[in-house]
């Protein structure tokens, strides 16, 4: 009996060992954790638990690998879309090729322009402006009884007669244009500036020395070189202020 029981127990152990070995062989790809669980399990119930554990771990590992692959694929798609967007042309409406080339050429031409040319152009402009200022000779003109004075360019005139006509247009012409005023049935002609003062008005000028002189006492060239300002005065008030008034 003892021999039979010993042989029975030995056969049971051998069967259990075979089960453990077969479980270990079938679950060898799973890893160290599954091997540890198999070595601690005994019997068919332990074998079933071992297979269930192996199935769960394999399913979780496969799901994690799938999720990781999907994340990597999504990142690649996002990077590809960003690269395609950066390569697209921005702006609407689109610019034609020849227009774009012309714009580029214009930008290059403006960048390569000689700065000395711009400087010379500015210098020439300043010189022309200064020449115009020298060619023009403005003097102030006032008239007794009129608070507002005016300026006149003497270089625009060549003689005393032209100057007198311009001053008459400025100060003595009627406000209604060139028409004469009618008073008591008589036509009133505009007042003129006469050198002899017979019209009641005389044109005087102040020279560089500050003396008041009668316009027309010297040649036109000397007058242009010495005049500082002009004044239309009444003959009665001009006595004693101009040295050569008649």
Swiss-Prot record:
A single GO BP term for this record reads: regulation of DNA-templated transcription
Q: Does the keyword Iron apply?
A: no
Keyword Repressor attributed: yes
Highest taxon of the source? Eukaryota
| InterPro entries in the cross-refs | AUX/IAA_dom, AUX_IAA, PB1-like
Q: What does the UniProt keyword field contain? A: Auxin signaling pathway, Nucleus, Repressor, Transcription, Transcription regulation
- UniProt short sequence motif EAR-like (transcriptional repression), positions renumbered to this chain: 36-40
Looking at the record, the residues that make up the PB1 domain are 136-235
Tissue-by-tissue expression? Preferentially expressed in stems and flowers.
Q: Where in the cell is it found?
A: Nucleus
**Do you know what upregulates this one?**
By auxin.
- Quaternary structure and interacting proteins, as annotated: Homodimers and heterodimers. Interacts with TPL.
In Swiss-Prot or TrEMBL terms, this protein is called Auxin-responsive protein IAA11
Question: What organism does the UniProt record list as the source?
Answer: Arabidopsis thaliana (Mouse-ear cress)
